[in-house]
Design a protein with these regions (language model features):
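Primarily a LysM-type cell-wall glycan-binding module
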Residues: 1-19, 42-69
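Non-catalytic accessory regions flanking glycosidase/transglycosidase catalytic cores in CAZymes
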Residues: 11, 60, 71-130, 196, ...
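Short, structured interface segments
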Residues: 30-48, 86-99
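Glycan-recognition patch characteristic of GH18 chitinases/ENGases
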Residues: 99-192
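Structural preference for beta-strand elements that scaffold enzyme active sites
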Residues: 107-109, 130-132, 162-166, 209-211, ...
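Active-site beta-loop-alpha junctions enriched in small/polar residues
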Residues: 111-115, 136, 168-170, 215-217, ...
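Active-site groove signature of glycoside hydrolases
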Residues: 132, 193-224, 273-288
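Substrate-binding surface in catalytic domains of secreted glycosidases
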Residues: 140-147, 223, 231-292
Length: 292
């Protein structure tokens, strides 16, 4: 992998020729079109092939992967145009290995709304171990608010990506609601109904994990919320489903504020199978469009 800093007057074709790569791939890796004008000082990622395979008639991605002793997904990751191409073409050149490419294992998780751009989803899934589908809300009686998750679940299955059922205290208006947290934590009848509904849904749809993303937990619900997570984890583990908890980024146990006072790192870590430490330096639907 190289980083090329653009000089005045350089084009994508010039840079591609310098490194011996295709202009199409250089453009794809940097999310550019070949017609884009480069700016002096702009940094471009350049991936240089080390092992290249020319496809023959009748070959498939699995057969080529077996020949080189690599996973089929490595072929797809190294040639991302394959996500939108159903069949290999005779005479195509595929990158099997890039120069300096690491084989160190890495597990990545990505959140996605049901309305995600399908091309973007297809380009991203080969790199993900988990796809967190955002999100299922619920009512004050413990009924789930359904989402159109089937297209994402099917796409995840194609790439062997595990799907994560994200549970949020979202009202039908689509916003976080502290009252829903209280009801789920304190009302045992509602809690039991909610857990039953989660179990039915994850089993019928083929989810691998449940992620509890509860925000704005009141201080008085702190321990009851932990017990809810503990009960949910016990039920899910019994059917082979793991449970994770998304945690707000606290810097001290007594940090004031509605985002933090109801979150007990130690107890929630003990109650769930894993935790996800969130950051708020991102763009999202109701905030700025990027990091700030």
């Amino acid at each position: 992998m190289s980083i090329h800093v653009v000089s005045q007057g350089e084009t994508i074709a010039d840079i591609a020729a310098e490194y011996g790569v295709s202009p199409n791939r250089l453009s794809f890796d940097n999310q550019l079109s070949e017609q884009d004008h480069l700016v002096a000082g702009q940094a471009l990622l350049v991936l240089q092939p080390d092992v290249i395979h020319e496809t023959a008639r009748g070959e498939t991605i699995p057969s080529i992967a077996a020949r080189y002793g690599v996973h089929p997904l490595q072929i797809v990751r190294n040639n991302p145009f394959l996500t939108s191409q159903p069949f290999l073409r005779q005479g195509q050149y595929l990158v099997i290995l890039y120069r300096g490419q690491s084989d160190r294992p890495l597990t990545a998780d990505g959140y996605a709304y049901p309305f995600i751009n399908k091309r973007l989803l297809g380009e991203t899934l080969p790199y993900l171990g988990y796809l967190s589908i955002f999100s299922y809300g619920f009512t004050e009686s413990g009924e789930l608010i359904p989402i159109d998750d089937e297209p994402l679940l099917e796409a995840a299955r194609v790439y062997g990506t595990k799907s994560v059922f994200v549970l949020t205290p979202f009202s039908e208006a689509g916003t976080f609601n502290s009252n829903l947290v209280t009801v789920a934590a304190q009302n045992m009848e509602v809690q039991e109904n909610l857990i039953d509904n989660i179990q039915r849904t994850v089993q019928s749809k083929g989810y691998s994990e449940v992620d509890v993303d509860f925000e704005y937990i009141r201080a008085e619900d702190r321990l009851a919320h932990v017990e809810f997570v503990r009960r949910l984890t016990q039920r899910m583990n019994a059917i082979g489903i793991t449970v994770s908890v998304a945690l707000a980024p606290k810097v001290s146990a007594d940090q004031p504020g509605l985002l933090y006072e109801g979150v007990d790192y130690r107890l929630l870590g003990e109650a769930a199978n894993s935790v996800l430490l969130m950051t708020y330096e991102w763009g999202y639907t109701y905030n700025h469009s990027g990091c700030r």
